[in-house]
Amino acid sequence: MKYAEISSLAIEELKEKIKIEQENLRKLKFAHTISPIENPTKIKNTRRLIARLETALNVKGS
């Protein structure tokens, strides 16, 4: 998601999206621990997406 798309989301949508992506990151890390996943950059990209979402949430919350 681009930051412009993220900033257009409502606060509740941001919170829900953060929960979904955190669960997704947990599953990716678990799968990578058991056997290496095909594209390990998914972990990095998901982590960065969560950071973008949390930043947008903090900006809107202020």
Swiss-Prot record:
Cross-referenced InterPro entries: Ribosomal_uL29, Ribosomal_uL29_CS, Ribosomal_uL29_sf
GO biological process: translation
Gene Ontology CC annotation, any one: ribosome
GO MF annotation list: structural constituent of ribosome
Keywords: Ribonucleoprotein, Ribosomal protein
Gene3D superfamilies listed in its UniProt record: 1.10.287.310
Record family assignment: Belongs to the universal ribosomal protein uL29 family.
Listed name of the protein: Large ribosomal subunit protein uL29
Origin species: Amoebophilus asiaticus (strain 5a2)
